[in-house]
């Protein structure tokens, strides 16, 4: 009998050292076994892991350990998404070089990750800021360039004049830079873009085949790609009201059926027609300047008050030359979508209705719901966007929406103006090409040279990587690469003249769009991938990460894989066969009377007759228990993983993260439940030790027959094995843990019996204990290794095969059925599992509860749902 209590603090580092010394998690690329690639989204090296990391990486580790035990060649690597703005901010605020800050953080976080006991192949580790990594990224940039997947184009960008950098739409808040607070300017700048739109339809169509992705993620990508079928219409402009040189206004609409309900046209502030009109209208120019000050993100525009300015320009209705529509500049029309212009049909679009109600333009319903009298159908404050038939639409009246769309398209396609059709059927996508230029130092350098004679010249492959200089300063705003006195000055590789390097660096999303492929052979010094290895190990069988990455990261990775295929680096289209989005870890918030947030470690929870009460541990001061929210530093409701591991051990943290909630839902942090997990660890330790003692008289070989007690325990063991196996395969980890607890209770009940177990039961106890340890080994690997040794098993449990299920033990001798009378539950009945319907009916009708419920009424019929319910109808 070993120590009474399990000592995680001593055991966990010891087993981690053994795993490392034996390199048991190293993956061999030439292993003949079937491969299984499990990958969690790699972390940004901020300096500390948070409790959400523990959950994310535990989920993947359970799967990796399980599949390894099932006989797969498991690839489970780890690396670092290491470029990005925080490193530059640290350089500015703390006077430390981005490189030093990043690698120091990596060292600290790697130590933390190791303490969790993850079965990672650390030999494949890399950081995206390693020149040996981004060398290959630069190579692929040039390959994509040659394949026509990279271009340089003028783009309107958000320019922060203080930080002197381009901001993403999401970084513009109320018209100001998120960090500097400066009023953001709109500028035209040369930007490098990846031509993701070449794959718009393919990226959309392929979503149907990603059947192991969450539906919500596929829907988010579908909406982001945003395919829409419609009609491009060329509205003529009234020459009496239009600036010189402007003759028409093109709009794309998905609702050409509503043309006779049009009340206005609206154009973006960036539309050439708006600029032409503003040149001679100071009030319009001022309006355009004002609306550009709001955030340019779609969310900001959607929530802003709808505003417009009548330019005085009139557009001619394509079906009636005497009917003209006012052209407004509106703050809700974006140049990036469609043509930057729309026609407004307020009766059938809520945004348009709000607009006309504000400006008094009126509305005319042109689609009437079925069964409604067209004469009395009016629209006031709520637009009608449902199905119906056309009204108030001349030759379209009485048609369905689909018929009307087709009729409008046919007529406008047939009508010519200036040698071209007035209407053209088109497919549009919301997806835009991916602008990757960033005016930042800490990113992957873009491998091109600008020569006054030769224009843009790719850096020769022999000169890669273009390495970031270390001797940079951040003493003035803007891009440190641009300020560097020597780095950007080079000789043109084409003509030998003076030239300059590109000083923009790549968007950090590029770094994470192919790292999964690099993990397949990170030792290849000459190419981004070793194709035969990548094609064998890819795609990732199970990818795990937050839903916040559902669109950009996952969509960019899907594009990048296709681009890598087009340039010969991989052979597959999709990078991730399975995608799982885990929930967050959330926690109560605690506040003092003055509203100051307090860290949970400083709070003591007292439970009494009046419920839960929180006090400040140091002073006894009452603390308000606030709502359960996402962990954040600002609300101080964070938990330090190091503290939990130090206090309870990694296995307790892992078990808690898996136990309370389905893994795709948020888990509420609870100190009480963490303590419950710690108690369960000790209980398992005692059960295993007691099983060893109880099994001392067990025969060395399997008994020929088993008595009822031994058979019942074996059924419980193999039933749990079957349920946990299926649960892990379906990623239902919390359900697996419930089955493990249930099985542990069954074993404990047998061990609690005072009588010495018979030899067959002693053998069954040893088997049950071994299966129990193997079942919890993916979740609590350190405890499992310790228990494995106590059981006298050779080697490491991390290298052991998953136990085989004896299917004949899963067949139940009896089954318990719910009994209903006229649909209301009246009791239960237990019958032989192979009982026929007449036997079941007899047993049910003999029940006193059934006789009482029938109260002498004759039985009309008995409905039997096999192995579930019997309903007596009286």
From Swiss-Prot:
A motif ('KMSKS' region) lies at residues 630-634. GO terms for biological process: leucyl-tRNA aminoacylation. ATP binds at residue 633. The keyword Protein biosynthesis applies. Gene3D superfamilies: 2.20.28.290, 3.10.20.590, HUPs, Isoleucyl-tRNA Synthetase, Domain 1. Signal peptide: none annotated. Its main location: cytoplasm. Its EC number is 6.1.1.4. It is an enzyme of class 6 (ligase). It comes from the Bacteria. A motif ('HIGH' region) lies at residues 43-53. It catalyses: tRNA(Leu) + L-leucine + ATP = L-leucyl-tRNA(Leu) + AMP + diphosphate. Keywords: Aminoacyl-tRNA synthetase, ATP-binding, Cytoplasm, Ligase, Nucleotide-binding, Protein biosynthesis. It is found in: Cytoplasm. HAMAP family: Leu_tRNA_synth_B. Belongs to the class-I aminoacyl-tRNA synthetase family. This is Leucine--tRNA ligase.
